[in-house]
Amino acid sequence: MEEFQGYIELEGSWQHNFFYPLIFQEYIFSFAYGHDLNKSILLETSGNRKYSLLIVKRLITRMYQHNHLILSSNDSNQNDFWGHKRNFYSQMISEGFSLIVEIPFYLLLIASPEKKKIVKSHNLRSIHSIFPFLEDKFLHLNSVLDILLPYPTHLEILVQTLRYWIRDASSLHLLRLFLYEYHNWNSLFIPKKSIYFFFKRNQRLFLFLYNFHVCEYESILFFICNQSSHLRATSYGALLERTFFYGKLEYLVKLFTKDFAGILWLFKDPSPHSVRYKGKSILASKGTFFLMHKWKFYLIYFWQCNFSVWSHPRRIYINRLSTHCLDFIGFFSSVQLTSSVVRSQILENTFLIDNTIKRFDPKIPISTLIGSLAKAQFCNRLGHPISKSVWIDLSDSDIIDRFGRICRNLSHYYSGSSRKKSLYRLKYILKISCARTLARKHKSAVRAFLKRLGSEFLEEFFTEQEKVLSLILPKNGSNSWGFYGGSIWYLDIICIHNLANDE
């Protein structure tokens, strides 16, 4: 975007949020496809695919025609477009259009006076950066709102919402054409197979629409936290780096402060905290159960009035941290009370002091993961390992490498769990499944095959950290087991593990 800024400054249209003329600029498609500006992508030839500005202009004109499905049989170019080339040209324009509609958010970001105060760190992209935040804050909170962000009932509502950011009617009409081009476009945000090809061919446009949709819903959560919190936490501010549209927050605060100043007295709370991952958000508070009910219905009514979307009350759950587990990004997290007895002696008198402390306890959802392994044909529904028959035709090294990679990724992602027995069970299932797959391939017994491979076979299922720790720590010492039992969060995990995201 830094390189892109120099080009959009040459255009006068962006100053008034008129972006439609930019789609005819050649450098837009160069940036969208990651090509060098010195090498024109619109003049590049790849097989029978030719690019030119004339193609783009004719394509948009043809898309606006009401009789675009009535084509001449003698026009081979038109038949090619509405045949196998239709998807390609549509993808090309949608990529350029996606880059253009991102301009308002980028301009707000570079114009924000607070941009220098936001910490730039790649570690903030890690999912595991959320858990130290939860460990620090959840011990002092009581209740959590478990929120599933609602899907739009009609994408026309999303287009209307974009009007607040993009004032160019031509760009909005072009967006409607992209959406109406596909069947079941009203179900764009619902995970169905009918929209798989739309997402595959238009990833950038799909991600922009989804992020914008989530950002609009999440803005009210940021507003509540900013207005209600008297002592703003630095860790909370750092987590805002995880969203790419934080530049609009200052504008929203001014808008909401003017319109909702008389309502906020109902929601004063000294310590609300909000965290989101994909379409799920949590809003934790130290307030009473009655206050959480107020927040719940306030969010429902606000979304209904602002987005014309009726959100079912069951999509927002109120959980007590002391009695319920929070299902979030692949962990069952809760706050447990741990008792410890301290012996104190003063002269000849001895006292036993019973201390109760809170401890953040993230658990592995073992039942869900076993179901995911069973779905992937690594075991049955009861957790008994079976052979992976699909991989029998692969070489031995490829089979071991695939099983080992899955096992290491699971160990890496769930290293923060306080209870490692569930993780050991998952690793055991993968080890035996790998052994049975190899034994089935070579038509031998599992026990005899494991005996022939020896200990080198098991090393493929250990992470690099586990190999180092096994050399440093004593094997029979109690300290080694205590160290492995602790939580270890890594700052290089940018997405949830696929097995933990089984839906």
UniProtKB/Swiss-Prot annotation:
Coiled coil location: none
Keywords: Chloroplast, mRNA processing, Plastid, RNA-binding, tRNA processing
Chain's role: Usually encoded in the trnK tRNA gene intron. Probably assists in splicing its own and other chloroplast group II introns.
Domain of life: Eukaryota
Cellular compartment(s): Plastid, Chloroplast
Name of the featured protein: Maturase K
Family to which the UniProt record says this protein belongs: Belongs to the intron maturase 2 family. MatK subfamily.
Gene Ontology annotations for the cellular component aspect, listed alphabetically: chloroplast
